[in-house]
């Protein structure tokens, strides 16, 4: 029995990893080849009214540029409305919005700090647009990115349209370049899922939903961008990813900042998955349940499964001592993660260290996320992720590449 448990602990992360990052993407890719490509609706004679929603907490440094680029997009000026929800900001965020000098830019201040989901809930009664475009305070929207997002929503049966993140940063100084590889893989997988039928989570940086779906309140500890796709599906709509609707997302400059961000976002994501567990029923939700299990559940189960490589070989020390190489590898990886977390800010990590360091920091973040879930912690409030103020990329075109 000891050996059986040991081998089970060792093989579990292998099986989950191969399925989540190999088998599942391959199945979805093959499945997508059997479906016609998702086609945007033609440009309408009259574009619908949009509310661009930004929930911000102490974003005085970056918010003005984000609003500037949002208002400069290729879209009729009289059809744009920007609503900034301040989560009881204590810096100059509120004054910046009040003094912006454009009647299309409005401020809704939360009297007490409750977090981004609470701000999104509060915005429901204040939106003016037929569609609500949610963006982060730190991202920039290229000029030609908004119309493709709207054209996707004009396709009958589509309730949510998600943009395509382009991860950008200071190539010479940052310590987290490996993040861009993961983001690229994630966006490609969403493109396959769109062709099959529906994505299971939107990009929190840039997505749009029908006003009636956005107005539905959600528990304040959930991740709305993840939950929004399931809300759309449960109301008979599909959620799609739009390749031409790009947004420029500055990478977190250090793996230390990435650890904080990932543990928080994954913790909220796990709580959201528990809340949405009914969506995993294949008899009711069909392909959506399959993709939810493959894209989200399998990935997030992988993190606690990695603990098996610390314990399993110890149970097999007599019958299969060679498996201790896995324990040694995990310990070495955790030491590497510790090294990357103490790397001086502003100095670029060597390529030999950056990618494995990112992987092991992500594993630690996953463990912390599960710990948050098991302890019943509800991660509603947040601190702005320390991203670069300036992006070394042009926002004039969506053709930028990570």
Pin down the residues of each PLM region.
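Membrane-embedded multi-pass helical conduit in multi-pass membrane proteins
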Residues: 2-3, 30, 35, 42-44, ...
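N-terminal membrane-anchoring/stem segments of glycan-assembly enzymes
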Residues: 1-44
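Short, acidic, metal-binding catalytic loop of nucleotide-sugar glycosyltransferases
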Residues: 68-79
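A conserved acidic beta->alpha catalytic loop
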Residues: 76, 86-95, 112, 139
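Catalytic donor/gating beta->alpha subdomain of glycosyltransferases that bind UDP-sugars
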Residues: 102, 153-186, 219-224, 228-293, ...
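Glycine-rich, basic loop-to-helix element that forms the pyrophosphate-binding segment
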Residues: 110-127, 147, 184, 227
């Amino acid at each position: 029995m000891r050996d059986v448990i040991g081998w089970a602990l060792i093989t579990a992360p292998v099986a989950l990893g191969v399925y989540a990052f190999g088998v599942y993407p391959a199945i979805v890719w093959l499945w997508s080849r059997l479906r016609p490509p998702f086609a945007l609706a033609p440009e309408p004679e009259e574009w619908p009214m949009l509310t661009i929603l930004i929930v911000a907490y102490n974003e005085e440094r970056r918010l003005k540029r984000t609003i500037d680029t949002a208002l400069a997009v290729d879209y009729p000026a009289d059809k744009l409305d920007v609503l900034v929800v301040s989560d009881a900001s204590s810096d100059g965020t509120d004054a910046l919005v009040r003094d912006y000098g454009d009647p299309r830019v409005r401020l809704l201040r939360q009297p007490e700090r409750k977090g981004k989901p609470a701000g999104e809930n509060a915005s429901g009664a204040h939106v003016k647009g037929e569609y609500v475009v949610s963006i982060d305070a730190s991202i920039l929207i290229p000029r030609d990115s908004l119309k493709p997002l709207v054209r996707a929503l004009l396709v009958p049966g589509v309730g949510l349209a998600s943009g395509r993140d382009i991860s950008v940063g200071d190539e010479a100084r940052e310590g987290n370049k490996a993040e861009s590889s993961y983001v690229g893989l994630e966006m490609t997988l969403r493109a396959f899922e769109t062709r099959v039928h529906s994505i299971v989570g939107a990009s929190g940086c840039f997505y749009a939903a029908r006003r009636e779906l956005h107005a539905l309140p959600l528990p304040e500890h959930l991740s709305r961008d993840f939950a929004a796709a399931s809300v759309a599906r449960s109301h008979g709509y599909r959620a799609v990813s739009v390749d031409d609707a790009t947004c420029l997302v500055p990478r977190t400059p250090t793996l230390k900042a990435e650890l904080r961000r990932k543990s928080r976002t994954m913790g909220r994501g796990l709580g959201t998955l528990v809340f949405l567990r009914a969506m995993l029923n294949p008899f009711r939700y069909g392909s959506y349940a399959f993709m939810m299990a493959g894209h989200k559940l399998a990935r997030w189960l992988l993190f606690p499964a990695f603990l098996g490589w610390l314990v399993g070989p110890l149970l097999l020390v007599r019958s299969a001592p060679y498996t201790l190489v896995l324990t040694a590898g995990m310990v070495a990886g955790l030491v590497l993660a510790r090294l990357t977390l103490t790397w001086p800010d502003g100095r670029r990590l060597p390529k030999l260290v950056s990618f494995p360091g990112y992987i092991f920091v992500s594993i630690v973040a996953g463990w912390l996320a599960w710990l948050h879930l098991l302890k019943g912690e509800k991660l509603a409030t947040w601190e702005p992720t320390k991203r670069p103020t300036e992006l070394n990329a042009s926002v004039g075109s969506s053709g930028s590449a990570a």
